[in-house]
Amino acid sequence: NSDEEKKVANKVEEKKADAAPKKELKKYKNLYTFDRSAEHYFALLITRGSVDSQKLMKILVDANEDWPGGELKVEKTDGKNFPLIVTVGLFENSTVAMDYLKGILKSSALKQSLQNISYNSVIITKDNLDALRKSGNLNVYMELFKKGYLGR
């Protein structure tokens, strides 16, 4: 009898899982999606110039020691049109990521390490970061970032 109850309970759980469709997000200019509730990274997108990536990552790791909520992972990668992308995260949503962005950009050590280079600092979801790395289309992402996250 208990085996039969388990089977029924499993079927109910399966139906619940089927009934909750994944959120289908509309793409902005066929490239990026906008979802404030998704996990986000803070990203420094280096577009021109040379920066000591190890020093930059150490500055971010040191700054993260003061961040409430635990360990943040600092990683570096690259992408089309980006010699260097440094990410910090993951943050539970865009609000938390934006709070981090506002705080970290006040760091004098960070400002000094980014002198004389071209870069953008943004918050971004994993899917959008993957799309940005492949496409290299920063202009479209910056439009979405300004409209969606900055309200401009």
Predicted segments, located by residue:
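Acidic/polar low-complexity segments and flexible, solvent-exposed patches
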Residues: 1-152
